[in-house]
A protein has these predicted regions:
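Non-catalytic regulatory/interaction regions at protein termini and inter-domain linkers
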Residues: 1-181
Length: 181
């Protein structure tokens, strides 16, 4: 059986199958943006519903400005609802604390909504610095649970971590919960 692959948009990674859950560590905001722009461009150009979970390091206004300058037709993608920006507090901490089961269910609901609207699948990126401010064990357990189920879905997930915000054991935790870094 042939596995359907998607363009990652990231040259060193190439094509990836649905169900890919990977991460990157970045040193600067520029490194983060240099990955996110081609990643989202590939998703938008290939009829994927895209979500960017923003943090204090990656603000919504900054993200919109960069994508508007870098992705041809970005205002059209935004207007038709193919791209969403969601603050991490609204996505991961919606009930005031992190609830892994609720977040996993929310991803599945977003995917189902995207498929019903005719999109090929769901592509998202999140900057996981928010996890440091909360329960790191709960966040790493969520990462492992997500990694165990993502293969069943038309989802591609890129988790971004500020290298300056992770110690050695946390880096090992992160790498262990992703297919590759």
């Amino acid at each position: 059986m042939q596995v359907e692959t998607r363009k990652s948009g990231i040259e060193v990674i190439g094509n990836i199958p649905w169900g890919t859950h990977f991460c990157q560590f970045y040193r600067t905001k520029k490194e983060l943006v240099d990955t996110l722009v081609p990643y989202f461009r590939a998703g938008l150009e290939n009829n994927e519903f895209c979500i960017c979970i923003t943090t204090d390091n990656l603000l919504a206004d900054d993200t919109l400005k960069v994508l508007s300058k870098s992705v041809k037709g970005f205002p059209d993608y935004l207007q038709k609802g193919q791209f969403e920006l969601v603050p991490y507090r609204e996505w991961y901490l919606k009930t005031g604390s992190f609830d892994s089961a609720r977040v996993l269910q929310a991803w599945e609901q977003k995917l189902n909504q995207a498929l019903q609207k005719g999109y090929a699948g769901l592509r998202f990126a999140t900057n996981n610095i928010w996890g440091k401010k909360n329960d790191w064990c709960a966040v790493t357990d969520y990462g492992a649970a997500f990694n165990n189920v993502i293969g069943n879905f038309k989802i591609i997930a890129l988790c971004n971590y500020a290298l300056s915000g992770c110690n050695t054991s946390e880096i090992i935790d992160v790498i262990g919960n992703h297919e590759f870094a």
